Amino acid sequence: MISSESPVGIFDSGIGGLTVVRAMQAMLPAEQIIYFGDTARVPYGSKSQVTIRKYAHEDTLTLMKYQPKMIIIACNTVSALGLDVVESTGKGVTVLGVLKAGAELAVRETLNGRIGVIGTQATICSNAYACEITALAPEIQVFSKACPLFVPLAEEGFINHPASKLIAEEYLDELLCCNIDTLVLGCTHYPILKTMIQEITGPDIRIIDSAEAVAAGARTLLADNALLNTATTTRTPHLLVSDLPQKFQSLYTLFLSASHVPDVELVEV
């Protein structure tokens, strides 16, 4: 029986989705979060659509064991190619994806109708953000740029490193020349680099953090359905992984700005 006490399930192909956990904890600290990172099969972006949809089904089944009141897809690839699979496997559980949440917020925020999107090679090549944005507002122009080095830079903790800034300037220069007024961070790793990116774009360009966008959407939907946990205690997330990377502890600390890493459970999918 789903109630306000039921957990919120979040899954990603790896550890990038921890930025969604961070955003959820900031906005909804009383919610019990079950996070599953499919670290044994990362990355998803290089897999076929058939395989990605299979993984989406299996990841959802992993979370359904905990009877969640909501499932958040913190993976842009699954958001683009497997949303319907998660919805059907979830059997009526509300499903949110970072892609749609980020696209909707970008459409609301742009003033000049020129939106930039940065993401991994797979996400940009899929054209998923551009399709989602133009489906919402056909008159908007979308300019996309793959930034493949941002993920390793984030995972190495090179957040304010001079080399990172040089790479970011090279990536963003093309988009800035397109007179965009809104920039979507189309990868869940990228919020780690948000401050540096904002320094390069300047204050006049609105940065859309898809992790924050999906957390805000979750808060609204939970409240609308009387499923918001109103407890005053802050809950520690329950972490599940399909393989335990050597750097998981340091990455968790980096992504959540946390001094303590909770126990991590190894699960089979």
From Swiss-Prot:
GO terms for molecular function: glutamate racemase activity. InterPro entries: Asp/Glu/hydantoin_racemase (IPR015942), Asp/Glu_race (IPR001920), Asp/Glu_racemase_AS_2 (IPR033134), Glu_race (IPR004391). Pathway: Cell wall biogenesis; peptidoglycan biosynthesis. Keywords: Cell shape, Cell wall biogenesis/degradation, Isomerase, Peptidoglycan synthesis. Substrate binds at residues 12-13, 44-45, 76-77, 188-189. PROSITE patterns: ASP_GLU_RACEMASE_2. The active site is at residues 75, 187. The keyword Glycosyltransferase does not apply. Its EC number is 5.1.1.3. One of its GO terms (biological process) is regulation of cell shape. It catalyses: L-glutamate = D-glutamate. It holds the Pfam family Asp_Glu_race. Provides the (R)-glutamate required for cell wall biosynthesis. Belongs to the aspartate/glutamate racemases family. This is Glutamate racemase. It comes from Prosthecochloris aestuarii (strain DSM 271 / SK 413).
